[in-house]
């Protein structure tokens, strides 16, 4: 028998976060989950859309991270919106606490994945974009797409 792959298996991605925030830095954190949450997460039944992280009492907690109840779970199923604890080193938590206290900075989850069988969260320190920033991003993306299209047409001829 061959070995099981020990790579990274992405489960949930918060694509909206990259549109609504300027990402300053990323870091990886472990997740503290109960059994039915892990099973439901492996099936991809989670939502990061409104999730955010806060530093409280020297620990980092993720709020509004929805993991659907496990279909085959019984009365011991989990609460879908239960705050989840993140596992980080003390110095990282202290640094994030200092960053979180700065005006305009927030901690948002970007994606959830399994790495060597353990649930991990890609956490970002971010600043919210203004409406005109979003419009600039859309305009630059459209300009890039038009340029690529014209280059492709020129190469065909």
Curated annotation (Swiss-Prot):
Q: Which SUPFAM superfamilies match?
A: Small protein B (SmpB)
- Gene Ontology CC, one term: cytosol
The main place the protein resides is cytoplasm
Any one GO BP annotation for this protein: trans-translation
- Location(s) in or outside the cell: Cytoplasm
Q: Which CDD domains match?
A: SmpB
Q: Which GO terms describe its molecular function?
A: RNA binding
Instruction: Provide this UniProt record's keywords sorted from A to Z.
Output: Cytoplasm, RNA-binding
InterPro entries reported for this sequence:
SmpB, SsrA-bd_prot, SsrA-bd_prot_CS
HAMAP family reported for this sequence: SmpB (MF_00023)
What protein family does this chain belong to? Belongs to the SmpB family.
* PANTHER family for this protein: SSRA-BINDING PROTEIN, TMRNA-BINDING COMPONENT OF TRANS-TRANSLATION TAGGING COMPLEX
General function of this protein: Required for rescue of stalled ribosomes mediated by trans-translation. Binds to transfer-messenger RNA (tmRNA), required for stable association of tmRNA with ribosomes. tmRNA and SmpB together mimic tRNA shape, replacing the anticodon stem-loop with SmpB. tmRNA is encoded by the ssrA gene; the 2 termini fold to resemble tRNA(Ala) and it encodes a 'tag peptide', a short internal open reading frame. During trans-translation Ala-aminoacylated tmRNA acts like a tRNA, entering the A-site of stalled ribosomes, displacing the stalled mRNA.
What is the official name of this protein in its record?
A: SsrA-binding protein
The species this protein was found in: Syntrophomonas wolfei subsp. wolfei (strain DSM 2245B / Goettingen)
Q: Taxonomically, what lineage is the organism?
A: Bacteria, Bacillati, Bacillota, Clostridia, Eubacteriales
Q: Give the gene that encodes this protein.
A: smpB
